[in-house]
Amino acid sequence: MENAHTKTVEEVLGHFGVNESTGLSLEQVKKLKERWGSNELPAEEGKTLLELVIEQFEDLLVRILLLAACISFVLAWFEEGEETITAFVEPFVILLILVANAIVGVWQERNAENAIEALKEYEPEMGKVYRQDRKSVQRIKAKDIVPGDIVEIAVGDKVPADIRLTSIKSTTLRVDQSILTGESVSVIKHTDPVPDPRAVNQDKKNMLFSGTNIAAGKAMGVVVATGVNTEIGKIRDEMVATEQERTPLQQKLDEFGEQLSKVISLICIAVWIINIGHFNDPVHGGSWIRGAIYYFKIAVALAVAAIPEGLPAVITTCLALGTRRMAKKNAIVRSLPSVETLGCTSVICSDKTGTLTTNQMSVCRMFILDKVEGDTCSLNEFTITGSTYAPIGEVHKDDKPVKCHQYDGLVELATICALCNDSALDYNEAKGVYEKVGEATETALTCLVEKMNVFDTELKGLSKIERANACNSVIKQLMKKEFTLEFSRDRKSMSVYCTPNKPSRTSMSKMFVKGAPEGVIDRCTHIRVGSTKVPMTPGVKQKIMSVIREWGSGSDTLRCLALATHDNPMRREEMNLEDSANFIKYETNLTFVGCVGMLDPPRIEVASSVKLCRQAGIRVIMITGDNKGTAVAICRRIGIFGQDEDVTSKAFTGREFDELNPSAQREACLNARCFARVEPSHKSKIVEFLQSFDEITAMTGDGVNDAPALKKSEIGIAMGSGTAVAKTASEMVLADDNFSTIVAAVEEGRAIYNNMKQFIRYLISSNVGEVVCIFLTAALGFPEALIPVQLLWVNLVTDGLPATALGFNPPDLDIMNKPPRNPKEPLISGWLFFRYLAIGCYVGAATVGAAAWWFIAADGGPRVTFYQLSHFLQCKEDNPDFEGVDCAVFESPYPMTMALSVLVTIEMCNALNSLSENQSLLRMPPWENIWLVGSICLSMSLHFLILYVEPLPLIFQITPLNLTQWLMVLKISLPVILMDETLKFVARNYLEPGKECVQPATKSCSFSACTDGISWPFVLLIMPLVIWVYSTDTNFSDMFWS
């Protein structure tokens, strides 16, 4: 039924044709069940395991690898001779990588689907209904409830469907609907129509929503929506419809994959076309098809070389290390890619209750009467320290601590707070914190009594459990609570009737009252000044109300409660306690004692975190279900708004936002920093508008209502104390529910991205080198310098270790003084592309050069000519060009070993280059990142392992090298450091952003100035090695003069 909240009880009952006392007939139930179905959220039809596995292979990079593996497998099948077994290694390793990748992907997908299933925990199992087949209430399965059913609910029940209240059977009905609306306190319900058809859920005071809990009272109602038509069902539909946004890094890698696939395709085709003339060479037995297949194999090797197979593993490792560091800071990351996304967060949309505030109501101000002279009076105003439920804090007057037992008015005020109260404090030993038992407002009063300690109770030596209610217990021993007059909407107060535990002539029964100031003070005829009772005058009343109004609308926007007593109440026998309409008569002729002002206080550390966000160019937006006045006041206290800042067009309620046209809504999201009284749909809409401005949005939430927006935003952040739905829909969970933890996580995310950039560039330059190597080999007609299994080893193992170690580079000191990076900023800029292309070309040329050196100039090598090397496929006994050359020499493992050793060594040098993007190695020596030094040593050890430990040389088709050959490897590899140092110098002095090329006027370029900051231990360590390497003769020059 649409807009049931706007209809009268009679209209709603008439719509369903039902009588409140008898309920639906079985025939009606059957028809309604057929029309509306079961009252449950349908199980999400998850993807099958096969569908999930297939989905993992939709990534372009993965498809290229899969194609390469399949082709390699087919080619290996037709391989002949000794190479048959080794030929299968390559496709097997590639498939192993892909399977591991798919397993991780499927596992993450399965986790994501749990979010929707977690909603089921809010579905009640049973419900109490009236139906015509029985005269009394009956318990049935909640899923069998239909629209039109008459339902009974009472304290402790979970609401089984969306219900329009028809009658309340207790004094009041309180409902905890925080999981749905985010309201921090339970809500009082009534049965009157709410005429506004556009009312938000918080304002539908005559409705109960499925999955919420009854905090107090008993009522009857008619079901108006079941299953997916309930408010919680709509959230489920929204979650199902919400597509998970890909993180900026995932998008970058997708783009990189596309570009790479195009480049690979072009190069593979080019290599194959270049060699068409060689298809009929004698080595292929004169068969054009065999020649075509041979060069197709080379093209496949090229594809393997071009794909950075180690990249996914290195990224995962770096992100995983980042998550461990974040977990130590109480940020538990559920989705690895979101670690990097945190680094470019530009907007944080934060919940108020529990995140920016403690979600622990505390009394921070109170007053009692000091003096009354005629129509004027003065007040004793006090402030209270401590902003949690811990009974630790002091009462201050004029910024000095006071002893509360010295003020009679405070003793009576504490007595009212302790007795007119059904809540308590409890120490949770597992968590090590004090928690509320009962209502937040009443717990704040319980905590106040503990801080006041009006009877000077000895508290030393008490355990934390005993300490929780020590002072309250002393007061409760003095008087016995006989009965309670529950809160009602008409009088806006509640009271307790108490009798002394030790009756005497002076001590009599009393009624203690607390409630909304305007309701209580209107019924006060007297005021308490010290221990005397003085008549209330209009002037005194005006003074009291002006202070209360100031507290309620000032910078704190306190929630005020007036406290009063009835010194001579009627006897219990004279009262009619069955009818709550009479309660207001018994709560008249009251004596005003004092007033307390409370709030859900901001966390102490939040203000500094908001300031840090502003420095880092991150906008903080508060989004709350609370009212606008309170929200703006908290914003001012924590620095989202300035103390006197005009909040027009910067703060909106959900209703005000809805009344704007779409373009005005979009404009509002661009400028606003506070949204109050919002519904779940508003949060999702705000995220959409922010995303339309290319903002990277982090959204916090803890309730079921937050789940769709958490899923839609780039970074969904759930509270550790939040619902399972919110946690499973999020990328990150805050173990301590603290806003400051988000800021720490953003800082960590920025550091991780900077390091990730370094190792991605390092790996890509390595792959460029491998591509250039194979392309040059094919273009020059040389024998294979590197084979696919060797390339896989380099990409996955020897390159992977230093790349992972680059993730340990220390973060920049000014990392939170820079604006968020643009998520569209390319991983590799034009200059960097040139730089790594240049390095890559050198790597490729050096690798091919090392193999050529062995053929042309090495001692113990065949010493063939360049022509013979580039036409080796024409080598046969009757060819005069190859007279005296053993054709088997072109299949020797030595040149391949030289090429692989140069590739590995040059990549280790390249890892040192990646220690800093633009800083020289002379100023930033390798031991700045000790993990990098360790990983380089480990990589080289693994390379020695495959060279010198049988049977690994056979698998990799290589052979051990002697000292002269290793010196040659070093000669060819070390120049890459000099080359990159030159490029860094250009970047530092001419291309660095914001760098002005101005000649310093004050500092002459003396020797000391030029050598300032150089690490001399590094220079002294490296110079002897370089001199020794280049002074040893290895016939290097012979290669060029042969």
UniProtKB/Swiss-Prot annotation:
<feature type="binding site">
    <location>
        <position position="307"/>
    </location>
    <ligand>
        <name>Ca(2+) 1</name>
    </ligand>
</feature>
<dbReference type="GO" id="GO:0000045">
    <property type="term" value="P:autophagosome assembly"/>
</dbReference>
<feature type="modified residue" description="3'-nitrotyrosine">
    <location>
        <position position="294"/>
    </location>
</feature>
<dbReference type="Pfam" id="PF00122">
    <property type="entry name" value="E1-E2_ATPase"/>
</dbReference>
<feature type="binding site">
    <location>
        <position position="353"/>
    </location>
    <ligand>
        <name>Mg(2+)</name>
    </ligand>
</feature>
<feature type="binding site">
    <location>
        <position position="799"/>
    </location>
    <ligand>
        <name>Ca(2+) 1</name>
    </ligand>
</feature>
<feature type="binding site">
    <location>
        <position position="514"/>
    </location>
    <ligand>
        <name>ATP</name>
    </ligand>
</feature>
<feature type="topological domain" description="Lumenal">
    <location>
        <begin position="777"/>
        <end position="786"/>
    </location>
</feature>
<feature type="binding site">
    <location>
        <position position="767"/>
    </location>
    <ligand>
        <name>Ca(2+) 2</name>
    </ligand>
</feature>
<feature type="region of interest" description="Interaction with PLN">
    <location>
        <begin position="931"/>
        <end position="942"/>
    </location>
</feature>
<feature type="transmembrane region" description="Helical; Name=6">
    <location>
        <begin position="787"/>
        <end position="807"/>
    </location>
</feature>
<dbReference type="InterPro" id="IPR018303">
    <property type="entry name" value="ATPase_P-typ_P_site"/>
</dbReference>
<feature type="binding site">
    <location>
        <position position="677"/>
    </location>
    <ligand>
        <name>ATP</name>
    </ligand>
</feature>
<feature type="binding site">
    <location>
        <position position="799"/>
    </location>
    <ligand>
        <name>Ca(2+) 2</name>
    </ligand>
</feature>
<feature type="region of interest" description="Interaction with TMEM64 and PDIA3">
    <location>
        <begin position="788"/>
        <end position="1042"/>
    </location>
</feature>
<dbReference type="GO" id="GO:1990456">
    <property type="term" value="P:mitochondrion-endoplasmic reticulum membrane tethering"/>
</dbReference>
<dbReference type="GO" id="GO:0016887">
    <property type="term" value="F:ATP hydrolysis activity"/>
</dbReference>
<dbReference type="GO" id="GO:0014883">
    <property type="term" value="P:transition between fast and slow fiber"/>
</dbReference>
<dbReference type="GO" id="GO:1990036">
    <property type="term" value="P:calcium ion import into sarcoplasmic reticulum"/>
</dbReference>
<dbReference type="GO" id="GO:0106222">
    <property type="term" value="F:lncRNA binding"/>
</dbReference>
<protein>
    <recommendedName>
        <fullName>Sarcoplasmic/endoplasmic reticulum calcium ATPase 2</fullName>
        <ecNumber>7.2.2.10</ecNumber>
    </recommendedName>
</protein>
<feature type="modified residue" description="Phosphoserine">
    <location>
        <position position="580"/>
    </location>
</feature>
<feature type="active site" description="4-aspartylphosphate intermediate">
    <location>
        <position position="351"/>
    </location>
</feature>
<keyword id="KW-0812">Transmembrane</keyword>
<feature type="region of interest" description="Interaction with PLN">
    <location>
        <begin position="787"/>
        <end position="807"/>
    </location>
</feature>
<dbReference type="GO" id="GO:0005246">
    <property type="term" value="F:calcium channel regulator activity"/>
</dbReference>
<feature type="transmembrane region" description="Helical; Name=3">
    <location>
        <begin position="254"/>
        <end position="273"/>
    </location>
</feature>
<feature type="topological domain" description="Lumenal">
    <location>
        <begin position="851"/>
        <end position="896"/>
    </location>
</feature>
<dbReference type="GO" id="GO:0070050">
    <property type="term" value="P:neuron cellular homeostasis"/>
</dbReference>
<dbReference type="Pfam" id="PF00689">
    <property type="entry name" value="Cation_ATPase_C"/>
</dbReference>
<feature type="topological domain" description="Lumenal">
    <location>
        <begin position="70"/>
        <end position="89"/>
    </location>
</feature>
<feature type="region of interest" description="Interaction with HAX1">
    <location>
        <begin position="575"/>
        <end position="594"/>
    </location>
</feature>
<dbReference type="GO" id="GO:0032470">
    <property type="term" value="P:positive regulation of endoplasmic reticulum calcium ion concentration"/>
</dbReference>
<feature type="binding site">
    <location>
        <position position="626"/>
    </location>
    <ligand>
        <name>ATP</name>
    </ligand>
</feature>
<feature type="topological domain" description="Cytoplasmic">
    <location>
        <begin position="917"/>
        <end position="929"/>
    </location>
</feature>
<dbReference type="GO" id="GO:0005524">
    <property type="term" value="F:ATP binding"/>
</dbReference>
<dbReference type="InterPro" id="IPR004014">
    <property type="entry name" value="ATPase_P-typ_cation-transptr_N"/>
</dbReference>
<keyword id="KW-0703">Sarcoplasmic reticulum</keyword>
<dbReference type="GO" id="GO:0045822">
    <property type="term" value="P:negative regulation of heart contraction"/>
</dbReference>
<feature type="binding site">
    <location>
        <position position="305"/>
    </location>
    <ligand>
        <name>Ca(2+) 1</name>
    </ligand>
</feature>
<dbReference type="GO" id="GO:0010666">
    <property type="term" value="P:positive regulation of cardiac muscle cell apoptotic process"/>
</dbReference>
<dbReference type="GO" id="GO:0005509">
    <property type="term" value="F:calcium ion binding"/>
</dbReference>
